[in-house]
């Protein structure tokens, strides 16, 4: 089928050409930065920059008028710590399953990217815990599943020690998420 990278680039270009976005930040594993750069150049002809180097240089790079900026998850987390936040009109997060644990440094930093549009890509389904699904969905639309305490009360069954023993209302969560997912 049409790859997730090409679909994300297509969505970004559609928004860019209709003037909804000017700056697009791609956050991906280090090993994929140059692949993303190559694909963006191949399909768009837009200017592309890989955000790398020392932190003071990277801080300036985020303010460059380049259309596409590409950064690794670890660099993004360090930069958010240094800058407080990162701004972009659109963010594309590749291999988003890396953010499945809500309270990790990288997941916390990812939530501090200010963007009007967020696209989360994964070729690996989240299979283990509903809490992991919440973490990823919260990046896409923080209002979709509500605050975590409400989510936990509505969908998670725990024992007397607060250990998760099962899940409930899965059809409801499926309906809410289906409006935001392409499988």
Model-identified regions with their sequence ranges:
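Conserved SF1/SF2 helicase motif Ia
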Residues: 7-37
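Conserved motor-coupling elements within RecA-like helicase/translocase cores
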Residues: 56-69
